[in-house]
A protein has these predicted regions:
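Hydrophobic anchor at the beta1->P-loop junction of P-loop NTPases
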Residues: 5
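P-loop (Walker A) phosphate-binding loop of NTP-binding proteins
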Residues: 8
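ATP-binding Walker
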Residues: 11
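Walker A/P-loop
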Residues: 14
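ATP-dependent small-molecule kinase phosphotransfer cores
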Residues: 25-79, 163-165, 170-171
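A glycine- and Lys/Arg-enriched "phosphate-lid" helix/loop adjacent to the NTP-binding pocket
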Residues: 42, 89-132, 138-139
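Short loop/helix-cap segments at secondary-structure boundaries that form the rim of catalytic
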Residues: 76-82, 125-126
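NTP-dependent small-molecule kinase module
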Residues: 125-171
């Protein structure tokens, strides 16, 4: 069964998945999958994002019965996966990453808030059998990729849900 590599936009999923691909893992870019199959809905101009019908996404994915090691994308934890690895990043660092990419203020605020309140982690815990999290804030992408490999190999200590806490950022 596939593993979801998920997290708030900007935490490093795509960069880490490219490293894992070079290390021999079969990676599915979920955003590309959605685009190629016409599963992106209306574009929300204010949020600079596309709407996605999650039920339709799941049905199309299951129908295709793809065999991949890792599904990368901020919606990947909504698919039928045994394990979700949630990449996390300290909100101030995440905000700077998004600014450097030229993202709109509203999109930055929405995603930083989602990271602060553990939105993706909570969703993943509701939809996946096993969930682990990795704080990418001070790690190089290759180190994050190695942590993902540790989890795949069964070395999960220190990656349990709740090990990353941004509640101080809310004060």
């Amino acid at each position: 069964m596939s593993i979801a590599l998920t997290g708030t936009p900007g935490v490093g999923k795509t960069t880490v998945s490219k490293i894992l691909k070079k290390r021999g893992y079969d990676i599915l870019d979920l955003n590309r999958f959605l685009k190629e199959r016409g599963l992106l809905g209306e574009k929300d101009i204010h949020r600079d994002t596309f709407e996605v019908d999650l039920e339709r996404m799941k049905k199309v994915f299951e129908k295709e019965n793809l065999k991949v090691d890792i599904i990368e994308g901020h919606l990947s934890h909504h698919l039928s996966v045994s394990t979700a690895v949630v990449l996390r990043c300290a909100p101030p660092v995440l905000k700077e990453r998004m600014k450097s990419k030229g993202w709109k203020k509203e999109k930055i605020e929405e995603n930083v808030e989602a990271e602060m309140i553990d939105a993706i982690l909570i969703q993943a815990m509701e939809t996946s059998e096993e969930v682990f999290e990795i704080d990418t804030t001070e790690l190089e992408p290759s180190q994050v990729a190695s942590s993902v490999e540790d989890i795949i190999g069964g070395k999960t200590e220190g990656y349990e849900p709740g090990t990353v806490d941004w509640s101080d950022e809310l004060l």
